[in-house]
Amino acid sequence: MIVPLTSVSPAPRIDILLPAKERFSPSNAGAISGVVRDLVQASRAAKQFRIIGTAVKTSLMPEHFTGLLPKMRWLNGHNIGLAAAYLDLIHRTGSPDLVEVHSRCHVARYLAQKRPSLNVTLYLHNDPRQMKGGRSVSERRHLLRKLAGIICVSDYIRNCFLDGLDDCGDLASKVGVARNGAHRWLKQPPTKENFILLAGRMVPEKGILECATAIAQVLPHHPGWALIIAGAKRFEESAPGSYEDKIANAIAPLKERAKMLGFIPIADMRDWQARAAISACPSLWHDPMPKAVLESLAAGCALITTRRGGIPEAAEGRALIIESPSVENFANGFDKLLGDTDFRQNLQQIAWQDFPFTDTAMAEAADQLRLQALIGSR
């Protein structure tokens, strides 16, 4: 049975501590800031949250955000500096019932050590085995013992945290999953247009170059189709030899059938996603639970993606999953999607009709895990 966080009396106060590098602002919000905004907005207990981060001029959620400057960052580093400034803040204003540290294992440990009376949870957006304070089994075992709870964005990330902790017994129940979600902004299935949308951060691990190369090979055999790339610099802005420049060179033979839009506002991205018949999320690395996958499904796109990280948790049965990412395998996948109308439209229908990955579902799962942490600490 789901017990809402709002049912607890008195209403618990929950502080969310962002990584120091995050900028909780409309123009510079990173992936974690976006998830935190969605978590709070979609929660039935939204009024109970305070978001703490590095000070910005304009906040995404002014009514919830408190900006701080990292304390003695030249000595402590930015993340511990921000945590130290946070401890000063709660010394003045009083402690929350729960403080939720996002994606910084060593910060969660620092707060738990400095203020043992604090109920500290850790919200993991990435593999903790690659993080300071979480790389070793002994470090993660310490976190498991000392923290009130650990929330993971996918089963994949949960398994990463518990790697080597088979002997932890009942403590494993402290590690839960609140799978990333996306807001479905469309009220009915959109009319699709004949183009492929390739959107995401222009970094090698996202597989944009391999995917673009594959599309450049296949698209000439499918008249009437085009390619839109969002997230890279425009052609004229791509520095020679840069990753964006390599992508631009790969798709140059397509001429007017391919466009690189550069970084675009979220409203424009939603429009492209709604119109795209096909969306590609070609991650080469073990992506924990990319929002691009969820948004593509929310928009009813025929999605092509990879069996990496937490992606299959959302994409299995709803998308064309490339088992082993390569230019050749991507090309075969696109050839299938472009050439088989029934197959493509069936994926679009499934994506639209079977979409449980809402921001509301994410917030509800996270609130349940927060409640579990609060109850366990009493």
Task: State where each predicted segment sits.
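Conserved donor-binding/catalytic core segment of Leloir-type glycosyltransferases
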Residues: 14-15, 151, 188-206, 211-217, ...
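Short His-centered aromatic/hydrophobic patch
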Residues: 101-107, 124
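A short, active-site helix/loop in glycosyltransferases that binds the activated sugar's phosphate group
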Residues: 133-134, 140-141, 145-173, 182-184
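A charged, aromatic-enriched C-terminal amphipathic alpha-helix characteristic of glycosyltransferases
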Residues: 186, 341-375
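Nucleotide-activated donor-binding/catalytic signature segment of Leloir-type glycosyltransferases, i.e.
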Residues: 241-267
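Short alpha-helical donor nucleotide-sugar binding micro-motif in glycosyltransferases
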Residues: 263, 271-276
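Short hydrophobic beta-strand element within catalytic cores of glycosyltransferases
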Residues: 302-305
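Conserved acidic donor-binding segment of nucleotide-sugar-dependent glycosyltransferases
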Residues: 319-328, 335-342
